[in-house]
Structure formats: C-alpha cells, structure tokens
C-alpha cells in the first residue's frame, strides 16, 4: 500500500489570490477530485495566475496535478514559477489524465513565497493543485475517501461538515428550473435553500453562456429570465429579495442521507474554500440536471427523454431517446471588415469527430443570431 505524505503544503489552484486570465472550473469535482484553474484563451495565452504562501525554510519536493487533455497534441501547457525561478518542467504535455507530476526540488527561504502559473498556449491548460512535500511520498491521485481526507487535513477542513441549518425545502441546482422552484416555494411561505455549483444562477441561460430559456414557460420563468445591463439574469436579485430564500453559491452537493427511504439531508462542498456543509429538510427538489440525489440515494434513474407511453406524459416524445445537455463548441460571432485570423487546432477533429451544429450562436447574452 502506497504511503501518503504526512506533512507538506498543499496549494489548491482555486485558492490563488489572483486568477489573472485563468478561470475556475468546478463542474468536474466529483469526477476528478477538485475544482481547478483553466487557461481558456482561444489560442492566446492568458495572463498569469498568482498567489503568495507562507512556508517554513527548507528543501521541498514539488508535485503539480495537471491534465494533458488531448495527449496526442498537448494543447494546454503551462509552467510554474516560484519566487521568480521558473521550473524546467512544462505541465500539460506528459500524455496523462489528471496526475501528480513530479517537478523537482526547491529550496524555500522561509518567508513569503510567490507562485505564478504561466499559460503557454491559451488552449485550456488545467492546474488542480501544487504540493510541497518534505518527503518522497507522492500525493494521492484518486478521488476516494482517502484522497479527500488527505486534502481536508492539509487544508485544515473538519472531517464532518458544518450544520448550516434546517429548511422546509432544499433545491439542488440553480438553473432556470431550480430558480423557479425555489422562488415559487419561498413566495408560498416555505423556508428554502437553493444550492448552486456555479457563481451565477440560470444554468445555460446565465451570463456564463447566455441562451434564452426554451420550451414551456410561465410567468415566474419569464420574470426570472429578465436580464441586467451586464447580461446576467435577475434571478439572484429576486431570490435575495425573498426573506424565506437562502442561496448557497458555488457549492456542489456530494452526498445525501436517508431515513426510511426518505432524504433527510445533503452535504455540499464550496468550490473555492473546500468548506463542507450539511443542509436538512423534509422536501428535496433535484434540479441538478444530472439526477444527483437519485444517484447518491440509489434510486432508479433514466438517461435522456422517456417515451410518451412510459408515464403518459402529453409533452414527452413518441419514442424515447438519449437527448440531454448540449455538447458543442460554443461561440459568438459578429461581422467584420476584414478576414479574421483563426488559430491552428489540429486536435479539433479528434475531439469533435464528425459532429457539427451551428445553432445557438449569440451576439450577446440572451440575443441569438444563429439559425
């Protein structure tokens, strides 16, 4: 059995003080073990992410957890600079999925130490964390309980989540359906908690993407879907104005507890701090889009759209299918007066294969200009 490091300094990328041009991606926490920083620059290297740590004077082994997301082409590459000295190792080109890559030995002076993540390509370099270890044992690479416990211990996070209250209703997922459920329940007098794993509400309709809600709508959906001048939905403002509603932003639900086959509480983890909380209620509404509560509790789940005959739903398709969330390279277009440059992306056809779809182009959030 591999031994885990018992001491050292774990620097989570999501805790960097200045992300620079890097962005926080927290949607794959359950699949790879942590939120991470993403250098999404459309082919132009993004500005550096920086932070400062305090460390005891001494010699440390360094590991960086990164991902080579297209191993045949290595599009997302970056370096790590420590107190002005750039390590020789270039991360994101070792042909491996999420992996703690050893980067050598460094002597730290014993005072503040400055760390810099420097993007080399602008094509989605990914950095999860940096570990300074006193011994030779490498950090745990998995997402099991042992790896989670190791991270908690080094970050000073309690083993048990903080009790953050009891509510009448807990809604998991802050897309349009989740916001609608939370707002309706709050206006009916219920004490509601809404848990959302992103920094914005609205899902695909939020300012992060900007699509207009489709399908059947009602007055609450139309109310939530109005936009501010910056393009964001007014959903957060409406919920903040409700005394019965509490929103937990950037929290990902990772477990649920049952009593006599009924969900009694859920646990959630904050994307930036790792703080873990527990929320209780007699009623839970799963608007995650991924049936996470069903999965955590062992309930039967379905993938895609069931047929009309299965449950007698009038709006269901005649035949079942596997349609679900969109998978596309999303982009915005505008007319120009000259030919625009386009970066070389030799891996693109390997990722997209033979799929193409030009629907859903936006000129700005909420305003589509595609077919």
Question: Each PLM stretch: what is its role?
Answer:
Residues 1-161:
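Extracytoplasmic
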Residues 67, 174, 197:
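Cofactor-binding loop segments of dinucleotide-utilizing enzymes, especially the Rossmann-like FAD-
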Residues 128, 168, 282:
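Conserved acidic residues
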Residues 163-175:
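Beta1/beta-strand and adjacent pyrophosphate-binding region of the FAD-binding site
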Residues 178:
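N-terminal Rossmann-fold NAD(P) dinucleotide-binding loop
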Residues 182, 186:
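Gly/Ala-rich phosphate-binding loop of Rossmann-like dinucleotide-binding domains
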Residues 187-205:
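Glycine-rich FAD pyrophosphate-binding loop
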Residues 208, 214-371:
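Aromatic-residue-lined binding/catalytic grooves and analogous aromatic/hydrophobic interfacial grooves
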